[in-house]
Every structure is written in structure tokens, then in C-alpha cells.
């Protein structure tokens, strides 16, 4: 039993004999990004292309002018077509413009600015970057990494006519690559995607790949020049770059480039910018929904035409809650870097949207394959595979991965799933061991290696644990060497000094031995269940007013009735967004600002209270003294109200 889809949003016909291959053959009209930008400048001229708080809008004409001006500058600095340029810039409009301008004449490789020095060193070396672009005067650890590798640094200098206009400053070098504007089969973008080993894979995407995806997304969402996307996604990931920026521009529309996500800012953004849509990962949607439920959102409903979700599974209750709160359809989709983002998507109303499904094929051909590579019929479980104009031609410098991932023209995603009788795709599991932390794919072995570097650790196994908002969070089981001394707090400190905070395990448990499978191999999948008892923390009541204040604040933010002094904030359901809320409320109560890293280094009420006691100002000490004079019942009531 199977179905054959006809294009984007086409009808499906039943076939009881044929295997299921959802098909789409629509290609991009532009050969490369420069052609798209130039055509937009001609057609839409002074209409806004990119917007942001505190800056003048950048028009389609200005965006093309910036790209056309940047390419000769890159050539003068020794960078041309095919040269990889690492970009480390803060989130916001300059990052979007720089990506487009660099891709117009070279290969853009945006990197997460939160990386530590060792990571920058790896990525710059793996990329064989021809140059690194940094903001003028930046002290990012990327600069030191580039210096150690001899990679030239190009500084982004704001122009005089607006923060979105800039020029490049660096040392002129001979141009070894081809000069001028990029063409269809040039690589426009390189991103790394984590694998089950500690070495990430490099994914090159051509202009043809990106623009095919732009057209696929535009057709799926029926994007028009009047549409405006509110982008809350980071622009060093495929989701933000392609779905939120390129797809909007491809339709002649506009994108609002926010500088940092905040659920509390979202109603203001809706009211001010009046976007017709936004796309985000489930973690962000959950934070937005929680904030929307806390205040009336009805006056803001009219601007949104739909809401889009991708990069991780969206829980059906969150989907239903968003639709109720905002009064528009939520469109869940399925994407990955190797596909230049979109592979499948639920359609817009009035067509059927199925909670729990990532929808119909929406771009490339999508099939379910068995282990031998045979295409399976609907209802049969197997590995999701894709092929089409948006799919990368292969990982760079990784023949082993290409040999196992590409087969008979299909790219095997590593995800397990099936099509139902109507051609809707359901993802049931990941065949790989990646931890999907709110859409951020994290390789567990990378964290293993950091923990194994601690002198007293004999074995470390990182694995996924369920998390109510992120979907999955990170935990690690550690076996100490005989006679070695260590504890969770010490190991977390060790990891925090060597990893970005989003890669540090929320729990590190000490065990005598890590459970193994029948063959004696470590099986990461299922470790959370097998170590469930060890992950449980026995309740212990807070013992000081500061601990009670911290515990009460965590209760309020997470909606819990009780929090013990040794309960880990992140294990209870906390994430970086809620961490900011906790610290903001505590700062308001205590009268001083608390740095965000504090809760990552001190994730329990006991540890955080001790940290706050050390940070307190004299007037806070006086307040604490006054609290101590109150009767216990009155003091507890007051603290609960904080």
C-alpha cells in the first residue's frame, strides 16, 4: 500500500501495490543568490527586506547594493568563489546581511558565537577557512583561534548610513580563487552537523540547493511579498537562515531580525512589527505559549497568518495551546541541514494538519527504506530517506560517512518513521545517538571526552534524558578510578570550563558501573530508564531564607508546588529561557543583577543560595536581618509572595 504525491500540496492517489515515494519536482527560478537579490532589488526596490529594533529598515535595493559592494571587497582581501569564510557575529540583522553578502561571492560558514576557544580552533581548521569575519574590536576567542592557525581576520566596520550597512577591513592579499559573483553550483553555505562520533560532519550546500529549498518553503507556506517573518531563530543554523531569512526574501517579503529571543518580548514584537508568521523550535513555542497564557493576547492575533514549528517534535498539547492562544494554524514541519532545511510539512488550512505528524513531502522525494535500501509501503516502519534538488551532494572530506549515508541516489536521514494511509509522515525515533536538546543536535561522545579528561574519571557515558520543554536534555554517568574523589558539582565545574553551557550535562551521576547491552557494548539509548533510580534526588527542605527564596522562585517559574534544596533546576524542567526568568525575579527581590552563568554553575537552591549570599549588597543583609525578626509563619508567607 502506498501513495504518490503530486508536487507541493498536490493530491495523493492510492495504490495497493506501489511503495510509497512522495514526489516534488519544482525547482528554483534563480540560478544563485545574487540573482535573487538583484531581481528583488528590481521588483521591490525600496520595500523593506530586513528590519530590527533600533535600526532603519534595509530595503531590497540596499541589500543588493551591500552584497554587490561586499564581493569586490572580499576579492581585494584575497577571498573569492569557493573560499570558506567563517562568520562569528552576534545574532541580529548584521549577521543576516553578512551571510548573504559573503555567499554572493564566496562560501559563508556562520559559527555559534558561544563556542569556546577549542571549538573555534576545530571549526576553523576543519573548514580550512580562508578568513574569519568578526565585529570591529571583538575579543571573541575565535580571534585567538584564528591567530594560532594563521587565518586572516576581517573586521566588520559599521557604515555611516545605518548599522545594517558596513564595510570590511583587513589586509589585502592576492586572490587565488575566482573573482566575481557566485553561480548555481558554487557552494554558498557550509554548516557542521553533529554525528554520533565526536567529529562533526561538514555539510556544503550550493546555491542550487538553497534556492530549491527557498521555493519549496515558499510554496508550502504560500508566501507573498506582503508577508513578514519574525525571526527568533539563531542565524548559524539552517532553520533561521533558510526558513526565516531566505524563504521570506525569496517571496519578496521581509524578515524582522531579533537580537535575542525572549518570550516576554514576544507580545511587543507582535504589536510593533505585525508579522504574518514566525518559525521556531518547540522550546521557544512552549515559552511563548506560557507567556501568552499569563496575559491577554487577543488584540495581537490579527497580524499572524500562521505559526511554523521545526527542528524537533512539537508536543500536540503545545500545538493545540498555540492555536487557541493566537487563533491561527500551527504548521509542523521536518527539516535537517543536509536537505537545506525542509523535507516535509503539514499543509496550510483548509487541508488537513495532523498533530504528531511532520506532514507531507514538501520539497524532495521522501521514502521509507528497509535495511537493504528497498522502498517500503505505507504503514511499514523503516528509515526516512530523501532525494531532490535541495539535498547536499555529500559531506565534505568524509568518504566514510558518504558511503553509509548515500545509497542509490537516496540520502538516509538516520531517522525512523512511517507514512500513514494518507501520505503523512510520522517520525518515531532517531536511529542515531544524537541528543536533540530543543533542536540543538549534540554529539554525546564530545561530552564524554571532556569528562574523561578529568583526572579521576575512568569512564563517562553521556545520554539523553526526557525534558518537558526541550524534549531531551543531557545527563552523564561517570565511573571514578579506584581511590579517586569527585562529585557532581566538581565535574560540572570542570565541564563548564570546557564546554558551552548548552552542552554541559544537567545531571552527572556517579555509578560503580555503566549498564551494558547483551553484547557488552554501552547502549546510550535506554540509559535514562536503566539509571532512573540514580537520577532521582531525595527531597530535602531548604534550610535558610535564601534557599527558601530561591526554591520559591523556581516553583513560581516552573509551576511546581515544592522544590528541595538539592533539586537540579534543569532536571526539574528548567531551560535557558526559564533560567533567565528565575534570575530576573531573584535580582528584583534582592536588588542586584545576577549573571546568567550563575544558575548553570549553581543549578540547585543550595548552591545558588550560597552564591547569592556571597554576592549580596549590605542593604540586602539588612533586609535579611529584618526578615529573621518576623514570626516564622509571616516570614514564610512573605517569601512565598516574592
Please annotate each region the language model reported.
Residues 19-23, 515-519, 524-567:
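Acidic/polar alpha-helix N-cap and adjacent early helical turns
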Residues 28-29, 38, 46-92, 96-100, ...:
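Conserved AMP-binding/adenylate-forming core of the ANL superfamily
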Residues 45-46, 160, 173-192, 198-199, ...:
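Conserved pre-ATP/AMP-binding loop-to-beta segment of ANL
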Residues 57-61, 181, 188-215:
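Conserved AMP-binding A3 loop
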Residues 103, 211-228, 238-276, 287, ...:
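Conserved AMP-binding/adenylation subdomain of ANL enzymes
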Residues 115, 278, 388, 393-394, ...:
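AMP-binding/adenylate-forming catalytic core of the ANL superfamily
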Residues 275-280, 289-353, 365-367, 372:
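Gly/Ser/Thr-rich phosphate-binding loop
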Residues 360-363, 374-405, 424, 442, ...:
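Conserved ATP/PPi-binding loop(s) of AMP-dependent carboxylate-activating enzymes
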